[in-house]
C-alpha cells in the first residue's frame, strides 16, 4: 500500500496509522520513515524464521499525539484497574505502548514463555541474512511461474510490470518478501492437487504454500480467488522440489 498516502488520510482524521510489517520485516521496509505511527509483526514468520514459536510484536514510534481529540478515552481518562492512572498524563506520547504492556498484556496474557523468547532472539540474529535470500528465491520462482503454461497469473511486486512494482520500489527497493501469489489452470481442484504435494506454512526457512480459500475462508465465496495459491519460497535452492 502507499504508506505516505494512508498516513496523510489517517492523520487528517486524527487517528494513527498502524502497519503490519510481518512479511517485509524491518530489513526491507521502514514504515516509520514514511509517516506510520505503529508497526506490528507476527514474529512467528520471518523474524523467528524456523516455525518453532508463536509470537507477535508492537513497535510504537512515539510520534502520535493521543490527546489531540477525544477518540482515545482508554488513554486520556483514568484507568481504574491500574491505580487510576491516566496514560497520556503519565507517559505522554508513550501512552499507547505503556497501556499495551501494563494493562492489555496483563488482562489477555499475551506473553511469550522464556524459551520461546530465547528462540525468537536466536532467529533474529540471522534475519539480515535470510531475508535477501528469501527475496532472491521468490523473484526467481515468480519469473519461472510467469512462463509456465499451467499458471494463469502471478503477483510478485519485485517483478517489473507487476501492478505493485512502483510502490515496492518506493518503499522496499531492496526487496519485498518471499511470498508469491499465483493461480493455476483448472481452478480449485487443480490448485488443491498441486497444493497437497507441498509443505504448507509461510515465513520459515523451508518453502511452503497456502491456498487462497484457506486464507480467506470467512470471506464471501465470490470474494475468494478460485484456484489461487500463495507460495513462500524458503532460503534453500529455489528450484528445490517437494
What are these model-derived regions, one by one?
Residues 1-147, 155:
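Conserved PLP-enzyme active-site core in the AAT-like
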Residues 22-24, 159, 241:
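Active-site beta-loop-alpha junctions enriched in small/polar residues
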Residues 55, 62, 129, 210-211, ...:
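Residues at secondary-structure transition points
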Residues 59, 181-183, 239-241:
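Short hydrophobic/aromatic beta-strand micro-patches
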Residues 131, 146, 150-236:
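Conserved C-terminal alpha-helix-loop-beta "cap" of PLP-dependent enzymes
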Amino acid at each position: 500500500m502507499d504508506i505516505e498516502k494512508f498516513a496523510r488520510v489517517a492523520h487528517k482524521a486524527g487517528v494513527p496509522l498502524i502497519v503490519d510489517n510481518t512479511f517485509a520485516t524491518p530489513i526491507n521496509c521502514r514504515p516509520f520513515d514514511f509517516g506510520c505511527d505503529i508497526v506490528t509483526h507476527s514474529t512467528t514468520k520471518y523474524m523467528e524464521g524456523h516455525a518453532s514459536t508463536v509470537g507477535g510484536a508492537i513497535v510504537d514510534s512515539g510520534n502520535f499525539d493521543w490527546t489531540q481529540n477525544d477518540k482515545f478515552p482508554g488513554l486520556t481518562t483514568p484507568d481504574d484497574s491500574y491505580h487510576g492512572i491516566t496514560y497520556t498524563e503519565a507517559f505522554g506520547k508513550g501512552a499507547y505502548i505503556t497501556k499495551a504492556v501494563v494493562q492489555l498484556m496483563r488482562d489477555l496474557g499475551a506473553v511469550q514463555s522464556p524459551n520461546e523468547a530465547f528462540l525468537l532472539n536466536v532467529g533474529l540474529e540471522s534475519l539480515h541474512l535470510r531475508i535477501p535470500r528469501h527475496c532472491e528465491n521468490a523473484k526467481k520462482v515468480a519469473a519461472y511461474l510467469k512462463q509456465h503454461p499451467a499458471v494463469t497469473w502471478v503477483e510478485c511486486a519485485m517483478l517489473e510490470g507487476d501492478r505493485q512494482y512502483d510502490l515496492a520500489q518506493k518503499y522496499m527497493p531492496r526487496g519485498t518478501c518471499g511470498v508469491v501469489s499465483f493461480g493455476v489452470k483448472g481452478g480449485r481442484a487443480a490448485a488443491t492437487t498441486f497444493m497437497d504435494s507441498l509443505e504448507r506454512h509461510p515465513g520459515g526457512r523451508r518453502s511452503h504454500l497456502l491456498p487462497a480459500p484457506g486464507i480467506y475462508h470467512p470471506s464471501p465465496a465470490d470474494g475468494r480467488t478460485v484456484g489461487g495459491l500463495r507460495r513462500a519460497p524458503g532460503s534453500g535452492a529455489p528450484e528445490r522440489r517437494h
